[in-house]
Amino acid sequence: MIVPRYYENLNVLHENTQPARAYYVPASCRMDDLVEHREGSDRLQLLNGKWKFQYFKSIYDVKDAFYEMGYDTGAFDEIEVPGVWQMAGYDTHQYTNIRYPFPFDPPYVPQDIPCGAYVHTFSYAKDVDAAKAFLNFEGVDSCFYVWINGEYVGYSQVSHMTGEFDVTDILKEGENTIAVLVMKWCDGSYLEDQDKFRMSGIFRDVYILKRPECAIRDYRITTSVLKEKAEVKLDLSFYQETAVKVTIEDRNGVVVAEGQAEHDGAFTFEIIQPTLWNTENPYLYTLILQSENETIVDHIAVRTIEIKDKVIYFNGQKTKFRGVNRHDSDPVTGFTVDVEKIKKDLTLMKQHNFNAIRSSHYPNAPYFYQMCDKYGFMVCDEADIEAHGPYMLYRKEDTDYNRFKKWNEKIADNPEWEAAILDRVKRMVERDKNRFCIVMWSMGNESAYGCNFEKALAWTKQYDPSRITQYESARYRNYDVTYNYENLDLYSRMYPALSEIEEYLEKDGSKPFLLVEYCHSMGNGPGDFEDYFQMIHSDDRMCGGFVWEWCDHAVAHDQAENGKTKYYYGGDHGEAIHDGNFCMDGLVYPDRTPHTGLLEYKNVYRPVRVRSFDQERGMLTLHNYMDFDDIQDFVDICYEVTQDGLSVQKGKVVGASAAPHSDCSVGLDIDVPTAGRVYLKLSYQLKKELPLVSAGHVLGFDELLLENKDGRNQTAAKWTASDVAVSDIRVEEDDAWIVLNGDGFTYRLDKRTGLFSGLQYAGREYLNHPMELNIWRAPTDNDMYIRAEWEKAHYDEAYTRAYSEQILQNKFGVMIMCHAGVVAPTVQKLIDVEIMWKIDGAGRIAAGITAVKDEELPDLPRFGIRMFLDKKLSEAAYYGMGPQESYRDKHRAASHGLFRSSVQELHEDYIMPQENGSHYDCDYVELTNQRYGMAVAAEHTFSFNASYYTQEVLTQTKHNYELTEADSTVLCIDHAQNGIGSNSCGPVVLDEYRFSENEFRFDFTLVPFVRG
């Protein structure tokens, strides 16, 4: 074999690597902007670019010493570094959540392990003032061997962590050749079973640092805040000792502390009346470490984080994490994400009210944390550890006790893995210790608990007692063993039901409660942000959480004929072991277009909320949910009064001032119209310029329904008002049909269904297909479990059959009463319905439907009617909740208004097609082509959905680019829909959002019309 089998040896994790140290970028002189532009340093030589590359399906196919000087790489391809080889067309993409993609046989991996050989030639100029050279790999999946100029340099693993080698004696002046052999898997892969696409290669930057012989090797900064000053402690270690001038400057370049250091040890500096860093004002000081031939510039902060009485305090303020779980993921470059991609993520997060990020489930590139320092995010830094696969092993006895015990004993509680687990935790802490955004060290994810994590926590707490520790998987253990949890600061949970949280707070509550993952954001959802927000803010021991997750993971291929990008998920590349579209669970699409769930989060976590509005006194009470800023310093509050969606009054709220976490009252004098649906909308706009967010950016809103004499929507009232003129409707009837002929209309009702099959008005047929009673919706990702019950009840095959009908007529119109049932093959009648149709002389159709569902059956997906309208009816105008989709539990980002949209724009294009585009709490909707249309209105609000896609097509189609349009504009008018929730990986839909009624009534009016 061409290399020693370190990749299957738990006793060899690294060879010839440097001890872990803090990340920094040195230069020959002071350079302040080396966070996002580190390539500007004259002491950092990037080796990124086009490398020679050959992919091998098996290590046994690597027969030539490709790393030797003079080896002919003419048969090699070229590949971009950094990058992953799957994105370059080699190997096969694979997405799996828990299951290992290879047999569980540690420390061994498949014998025919795929690998990639990299070769790159570069020019190197030696620097007499920086004669040392250190080769850095910031990310290689899964392990690698490296040679320079034919000479073996070393070996390393831990995919998401830096491997550094001293190559001073190997590099030569002029041309040099580096060769790297990367293995797809290694023993470390058992610890890298994260829920993501599995990709391989040199996926982060490769560079050489030029260093003086006498230079700082490592430094550590800690700060403590006293009464009117801060102490900055600097621990230094050197390769060889040298005099170092230490300077600390404030944001304006004013020196606030300085001194000298010449040897290993600790040095303390004072900052008088320091400005503390926080997420609303990320104030950084500049630290300059200047020696004879080198300068290191760092940006440091002064801040505190502590737990008192089971409550987290940041700079002395009670704090909640408004966080999100973030993977490195890009649909084109995979794991490789550069500064600009990270900055785009951080910008969107800031714009949508996040203040914290969990680096799920591995350390990010080191500059990510510098950017979080700069832009104001708290970070939970997570070790590159997930050993979830043993949870899926075969067990004869599949009980929780046995499942957790078997999971636990394989790795977490197996001393053979101690060195590997501690190595990963220590390397993370050592590299990232100077990043003040990091408030929490996480030992990893979903790896169970045992002696190895006890030791990792003990080392972390001893080394860095200034930060919080968390490890959610501590709860998965061998129940026969007593473990030590004293070094674990938080009680962390994933996706708990609200009742479970309440129980913990009531019966235990010994540690702050962290929702380390919650509100699974897969597809259309989540629908429970507001409910978790209320829980988080109900108790100071609740310290917030991290939504799962930031982005949909997908691989972008070419464009379909309809212009849509073909995004592939699990199974689309032919892989046998995969988890389908479970990777499509983000708040943004792969290209970072926001999901409606992101908008929902933003408004739920708005910085200010209305507590109450005394309309009679004109007194508004507000609560400040910010941690550090007064309302008056952070936001401008603008108000608007609307009547049936039209603006009638605007202005600015003046004098609102409330300290963090407190209330204020302020006068607001407005005129309330006597008729119409009248809403007061308050918009919270950023007052000051923030990093990444401009002044004037809207951070959220509140709306309040105001009381008046006639609160009906006046347009809806006109649509629903019956024509009292004498009508002349002729009724024709046979065994199958009832035909109504009026002045300018002919309606055809099918006696077999009790529903209309034709609506001809002003010479045009409005229905392309018969009307239906509708109980099915294309299952959302969050319906994945209840879907089985729905299909067991055959809701997806339901149709309507009528039993009897009765016609009554008077001078004002015709009434048709039908007794019908919603039925499906092989099961009992689903719903018994009584339908009453009232048709007046103007052609207006008033409907009243009384429904009784069989109590044995599961909650309904929805109930309403579905109409297949003339496709030329392509424009929608509606009064209800918009402009984005809204549901009974997912409508906090929507507001009441009069909205206009094309039918095409009403479709929310989830990559896995599903129910979408509904609008909640509507008074009316009109579908038109400007010349004629159909209006639906009601005295009691309803939901509607207008689309070119049927629910059948949405149910059956696996990708959005494969969707086929119907020949109609499909209009669904719903009495109700089941809630959205987050049950794809969370609790069931809350009771108050379930469509659990067994008896209900639905009234609405259909009005065909012609403009002009």
Question: Where in the sequence are the language-model features?
Answer:
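Extended acidic/polar, glycine-enriched regions
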Residues: K172-E175, S237-K308, V678-A716, T720, ...
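Extended substrate-binding grooves/exosites of carbohydrate-active enzymes
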Residues: M1-E39, T96-I98, Y190, E294-T621, ...
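Beta-strand/loop-rich accessory regions of lumenal/periplasmic or secreted enzymes
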Residues: M87-G89, K184, N278, D669-G676, ...
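Accessory beta-strand-rich segments of carbohydrate-active enzymes
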Residues: I2-E15, H37-R38, K52-F56, V84-T92, ...
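Surface beta-strand/loop "capping" patches
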Residues: E213-Q240, H595-V635, T720-D735, I849
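An acidic-aromatic loop/edge-strand motif
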Residues: V84-M87, T92, R99-Y108, Q157-S159, ...
